[in-house]
Amino acid sequence: MKTQLDIKNVLRKGFISDEIEFERVLILYRKLRLVKENRPELSESYNQLRVLIKNYEEEHWNNETEITEDRINESDTAEFLAEQERLFLQQRKELIKTKLIAFDLNQQDLGVLLGHTKSYISELMNGIHPFSNKDLIIIHRIFGIKLEALIPTMIPTMEQSRLKDSLAKINKPNFYSKLKTKNQGVAFLFL
């Protein structure tokens, strides 16, 4: 499940697909603005993201007559989800840093454990690139961090829609009521 944006894929693709990707790109753009001073090799990616953002805004938000209430709601939802993802990634970063300190290790040592360079592990920790599942499993096994704290469990927007349709299709009231009882409503599926 992809919840964290991979800068390489977006730049390779050359455009922003939808509102959630747009919000993720905005967050990544802000992160790059902060780190590019110390990492000049990221300046080109920063500039390319700026062009993608500008193009998306011109195509989707430039004409006021085409901006509907639905589009605004979609944007608000995407912004909320992207912010939840950002907070999750920030908490994960802090949790990993805390464990590194407890084990008397530093970020560079983590890079050695995961087989990554010093600069790449910095990009992973700062959310410029996503950790691989393999990396997160190794971190889980070495440091005893729960997988739920390492791997985002938010359901992507497209899957939410499919899941809502599937729940309606199944039409099993007993199943649905158990879901509601166990999880105080089905809304938990969509956060």
Regions found by a protein language model. Name each.
Residues 115-131:
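Recognition helix of helix-turn-helix/homeodomain-like DNA-binding domains
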Residues 151-191:
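Short, charged recognition helix plus adjacent turn
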